[in-house]
Amino acid sequence: MSNETSNQQAQMLRGTVWLTASNFISRLLGAAYIIPWYIWMGKHGAEANGLFTMGYNIYAWFLLISTAGVPVAVAKQVAKYNTKGQEEHSFAMIRGFLKFMSLLGLIFAIIMYVLSPVFANLSGGGKDLIPVMQSLSWAVLIFPSMSVIRGFFQGHNNLKPYAISQIAEQVIRVIWMLLTAYFIMKVGSGDYVEAVTQSTFAAFIGMGASLLVLVYYLWKTGLLQHIIHRPESDSQIDTKALLWDTIREAIPFIVTGSAIQLFQIIDQMTYSNVMSWFTNYTRSELLVQFSYFSANPNKITMILIAVATSIGGVGIPLLTENYVKGDLKAAGKLVQDN
């Protein structure tokens, strides 16, 4: 076995450990917070959980259509250009993609905020669901550009910043959720809708922390100055072609990644409305039922899904590197090890 192959296997192992640990910790925190949170919501626990889940399903859908496949596609392109010795193409692509994804985040955040009343009505959540969805639109503003930076690190086979940013995001998010839920329900007004709204706004707070971690590691590794300072030779690079090439790479990931979220959206848009036609259940009772069959099981199943998908994505930059070099034997060995 060559030294290069051994080095790639070590890189893949380190990346797998970092991403698996971060995904497991993040999802576990996302499942564990519900215990004190649910208790503090008192008699409105199930309704609050239902509102939270309905808001998050729409929010996750917006994240999906605005960023699905971007981290992996960016990682693949960065690995390709670096292997060819065209690092300036990587930095040019990142500069262009950060601008493009920031604009995309702004557009989708506005759309989600403005259409929240429509989505709330279609979901059967009523007016209580509107502020919950609107609070989540702020996170949509940040996430697309943040996903580009994560993909950039993945393309350099440095998954430590990616992993730590995920953990920081979840830790800060859960802290904000629990603090605001406690103070609103136990010290303040006791308005559970306000508490849920702050709990969903925590996604924005968590992403802010995650973005700070990523920027810190960009600065620490010396990559930030290469992104900020555009060399004169950059004007000779067709940035639009680089962007389109990367977007084209992301399309398969968008298609394959949308299935689970699409099924959840269909459930959300149909359950309460259909049940209200054929039963005498109130909106609150239907919200409780939705919470039982949709909200709680997903928190557990997503732990396993996140861990499995993280393992599959780690080797993509290394596979790209071997493919560009024409070393199909090394690529096959990586697939076998993965």
Model-assigned labels for residue ranges:
Residues 53-77, 141, 294-317:
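Small-residue-rich midsections of specific transmembrane alpha-helices
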Residues 143-165:
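Membrane-interface junctions at transmembrane-helix termini in multi-pass inner-membrane proteins
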Residues 80-97, 292-338:
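Specific pore-lining/lateral-gate transmembrane helices of multi-pass inner-membrane transport
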Residues 107-125, 130:
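Short membrane-interface helical motifs at transmembrane helix boundaries
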Residues 38-60, 192, 196-197, 241-249, ...:
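Interfacial/gating helices of multi-pass transporter permease domains
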Residues 20, 94-109, 250, 338:
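Selective transmembrane-helix segments that form parts of the transport pathway or gating/packing helices
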Residues 1-32, 88, 92, 234-260:
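N-terminal membrane topogenesis motif
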Residues 165-179, 188-223:
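Hydrophobic alpha-helical transmembrane segments
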